[in-house]
Amino acid sequence: MAPQIKRIGVLTGGGDCPGLNAVIRGVVKSASNLYQWEIIGIEDGFEGLINGMTRPLTQSDIKGILTLGGTILGTTNRGNPFDFVDRDGVKKDLSSVVIENIKRLSLDGLVVIGGDGSLAIANQLYKMGAPVVGVPKTIDNDLSATDVTFGFDTAVNTARDALDKLQSTAESHHRVLVLEVMGRYAGWIALHAGIAGGADVILIPEIPFDRGKVCDKVRRRFQGKTGFAIVVVAEGAKPFGGEIVTQAPAEKGRLERLGGIGNRVGNDISMCMGGDIDVRVTVLGHIQRGGTPSARSEERRVGKECRSRWSPYH
């Protein structure tokens, strides 16, 4: 028989996305109203479990956060307890510290709201005996255990809205407009937004692209009566035989920072068109992570469902 649950912890890890606060709200409302559990908020992801940065979460803490972007608990891409990098750049395994802090806080359960990296850490902690429930969040939609992650739909809507605006200016000025979107090594945002926004070319990480074919497609748009073109490229896309473009390498516990492929594609198109066509590049960037979650998102229900997924210490 599972032990009686009295206190749970909740943290948000990795990159932020729309809907994090809605999940936190769902967890707190369900746990406190239905089961009278005490909820402990862990600040700045797993770093909070390592450094003991926690605070109680009550009904007053979640007022007005349903549609609020970001996360009231803070988050970080650093702080992997299994590969923690200290200020001197020394890597340490602090997973035992996390397990001890979970026990010290008397947590009967831990809700980890995160993407592939955070949930991989959560799975490792579960194997060490921690009572963990993972909530799949990421704008990248790259988690295999669920069809759609929360945050993805809102990011797609943001990218599609940008395409709507770019299309009118591209047509007015007879330009090629290249839009670089996020997604890391997955092309879901580029694909869905590109289709919805009527892009002429969509480049995704899963399919290396041929520079010549991209240029041919753009050239045909200008040979006809259209006179403009829209290209959507995911940040992790790369040409045949090429490498993913990065802005910064992986170091000090951080993942490599992707970005720059949009400008590469724009330069390629400009060169193959002989410089006769005006090519402009827009990098959508972190605007895809912010703002109010879309109406289609199901963060509140996900937050409330956490309570039925507990596993006891094993």
What is each PLM-predicted segment?
Residues 101, 112-114, 120-124, 131, ...:
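Accessory alpha-helical/coil subdomains and C-terminal extensions
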Residues 284, 289-301:
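Mobile late-domain/C-terminal helix-loop "cap" segments
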Residues 299, 303-314:
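Positively charged, low-complexity/disordered segments
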Residues 1-13, 23-108, 113, 117, ...:
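A cross-family phosphate/adenosyl-ligand binding-site feature
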Residues 13-16, 42-47, 77-78, 115-118, ...:
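Short, ordered loop/turn segments at secondary-structure junctions
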Residues 141-143, 147, 249-253, 292-294:
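Short beta-alpha connecting loops at secondary-structure transitions
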Residues 49-110, 116-197:
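Small/polar-residue-rich loop-to-helix segments that shape phosphate-bearing ligand pockets
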